[in-house]
């Protein structure tokens, strides 16, 4: 470990963590495709926090745009069941760090440790739907809901995280995005046309996994994935087949043997530890035709959610998220300038001054305000000094 002014440099799993001196006691807690997450102690508040390093955010325009999108979403979406952005800073090595409240575990780890009791299944489902109602009202689709993106603390408070794949509600969408087990069939069938209903399919898969303790559709590849979905739901109806854009996909679906659906109360007959209403809600989420799939707002009014449903405490987002940047094809340096601006804006809006442990240094602010921001074309080598 070494210290350089306001920043301390530590190597974790071969990765340099260069964070402000406000955060101490780093310990790795998770690794993803785009970042490493460490727990830390916030010396200012005394709270445990999660510090996420975004790996090489300016190495390509695609990664820069993805990071910018996640930052914009975290700033805009403020809800009890969504992870909130407590701090963000840019290190001297030009890595970006997001700081959030540390949650004790995630649903994936919880499910692999022990079976869930029915009251926890019900409460977790309610909180996921409550968060989704808010996300969808902002004009946002999460696109990557899965147990590892559902964070839970010791009080069973639940927060949805990882908005890096989130996308505008748009009839033309891009291909494979979510972990296969939780991927809606319309993503596999059409690749381009889907909406908020893909998230409800994912919730159905998560609910089934909480009930049975194992993934409902553990496909080995997308062909196998679709095949085992049809084992439960039967062959897709003609109106769904008519939406398939790809000729290859259409030929594949038409080549499958006809299958009749299995009634959900028969498929889950052994799951006597949960209420029949849970299976009924599950059946309303796992429907081939997304237009017939239940919405998050409607799911909150389902009888299974009755013990927790409170229409006065299930807010929507007051303003739609601004997606105007999303179709932009910009060079890395432009995304970098936009990112600097968002970081500075975050600290100004939050009212974070020097007395409160400001993470953006005066040197950074001066750098941000320079005309053109003469940033390096390539990220600097990350070497521990």
UniProtKB/Swiss-Prot annotation:
Superkingdom field: Eukaryota
UniProt keyword Transcription regulation, yes or no: yes
Main localization (coarse): cytoplasm
UniProt activity-regulation remark: Activated by tyrosine and threonine phosphorylation.
GO cellular component, one term: mitochondrial intermembrane space
EC number from the UniProt entry: 2.7.11.24
Subcellular location: Cytoplasm; Nucleus
Sequence positions bearing Phosphotyrosine: 176
Residues found modified as Phosphothreonine: 174
SMART domains: S_TKc
Biological role: Proline-directed serine/threonine-protein kinase involved in a signal transduction pathway that is activated by changes in the osmolarity of the extracellular environment. Controls osmotic regulation of transcription of target genes.
The protein, known as: Mitogen-activated protein kinase HOG1
């Amino acid at each position: 470990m070494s210290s350089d002014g306001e920043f301390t440099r530590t190597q974790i799993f071969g990765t340099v963590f260069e964070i402000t001196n406000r955060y101490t006691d780093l310990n790795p807690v998770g690794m993803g495709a785009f970042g490493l997450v460490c727990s830390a102690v916030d010396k200012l508040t005394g709270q445990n926090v999660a510090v996420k390093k975004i790996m090489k955010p300016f190495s390509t325009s695609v990664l820069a745009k993805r990071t910018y999108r996640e930052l914009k979403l975290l700033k805009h979406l403020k809800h009890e069941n969504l992870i909130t952005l407590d701090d963000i800073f840019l290190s001297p090595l030009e890595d970006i760090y997001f700081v959030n409240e540390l949650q004790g575990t995630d649903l994936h780890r919880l499910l692999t440790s022990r079976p869930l009791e029915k009251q926890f299944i019900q409460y977790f489902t309610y909180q996921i739907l409550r968060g989704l109602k808010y996300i969808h009202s902002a004009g946002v689709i999460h696109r990557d809901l899965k147990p590892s993106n559902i964070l839970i603390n010791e009080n069973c408070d639940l927060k949805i995280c990882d908005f890096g794949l989130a996308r505008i509600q748009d009839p033309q969408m891009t291909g494979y995005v979510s972990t296969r087990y939780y991927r809606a069939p319309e993503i596999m069938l059409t690749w381009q046309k889907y909406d908020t209903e893909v998230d409800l399919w994912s919730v159905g898969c998560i609910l089934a996994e909480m009930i049975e303790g194992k993934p409902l559709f553990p496909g080995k590849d997308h062909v196998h994935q679709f095949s085992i979905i049809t084992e439960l739901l039967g062959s897709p109806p003609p109106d769904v087949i008519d939406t398939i854009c790809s000729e290859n996909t259409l030929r594949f679906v038409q080549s499958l043997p006809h299958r009749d659906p299995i009634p959900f109360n028969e498929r889950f007959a052994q799951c006597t530890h949960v209420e029949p209403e849970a299976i009924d809600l599950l059946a309303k989420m796992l429907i081939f035709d997304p237009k017939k799939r239940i919405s998050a707002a409607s799911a909150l009014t389902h009888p299974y959610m009755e013990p927790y449903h409170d229409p006065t405490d299930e807010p929507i987002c007051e303003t739609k998220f601004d997606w105007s940047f999303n179709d932009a094809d910009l060079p890395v340096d432009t995304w970098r300038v936009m990112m600097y601006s968002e970081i500075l804006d975050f600290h100004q809006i939050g009212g974070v001054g020097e007395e409160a442990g400001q993470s953006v240094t005066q040197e950074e602010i001066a750098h941000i305000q320079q005309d053109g921001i003469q940033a390096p074309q390539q990220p600097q080598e990350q070497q521990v000094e």
